[in-house]
Amino acid sequence: MPELPVPAEEAEPRPAVARPPEPLALSINGKPYFHDGDPAMPLLWFLRDVLRLTGTKYACGVGSCGACNVLLGGKLATACTTTMAAAAGHDVTTIEGLSSGELHPLQQAWIEEDVVLCGYCQSGQIMAAADLLRRKPRPREEDLAGIAALCRCGSYPRIRRAILRAAKTLRDDAR
């Protein structure tokens, strides 16, 4: 009978997951939350797996596609590369928290411009657009070229029109 392999005794044991000394506090869509798990956990998994906020999508996992875009402290961030430790103490806004009750002007413009094809990138696109309009309420065409989310379906012309429509709506509503 052959011998069963035995793990090498000199193999390094795996380190235990570092736990924060106290739970990490953050606000998500205006509600307070605490995380007492691994501080290196990506914010994306906390949103999707713990809170079941599945509007923020997983795609590339390295922060380059924009499917997981959220607002962190009011600024655009990729949830797949933002750790819970980095998110602690900040306000996080996901697509679910972009508006309360009625559609946000960006969401309405997305519908009116018939932007959605497959829809997978749309929450990331909308969050990137929200960040852009916060910084530039009157975006120019060149501002729209650098929108921070990739779209496999090629909806970019419709996305640009929707952002310009939403910008006008937001300006008109501010009057």
Feature-to-residue mapping (PLM):
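Signature of N-terminal electron-transfer/Fe-S-associated modules in redox systems
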Residues: 1-175
